């Protein structure tokens, strides 16, 4: 199977934006920090896995933002990072960081499992 470079992403509103691995890394790192499991490189490390997967296995050249988010969740769970995956899922739902933290704290304290 030929490897293709992922150059763009189709956003929820239908517009196409440049693919930015750094945005994925930052989102993973934020979730890792929120879950208390940030090792300083997990965002970059797993974002590169997401990019490699997309380049090798994605059927279309332009993945959607939803497909990328689902892939991030899968990779987080598959690599044994379920607490980070849970934080990432919650984080996706909130644009406001303060609202995100208010929702996340009870989950982390209560040991909620997905």
Regions from the language model: what does each represent?
Residues 1-114:
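Extended catalytic cores of very large enzyme megasubunits
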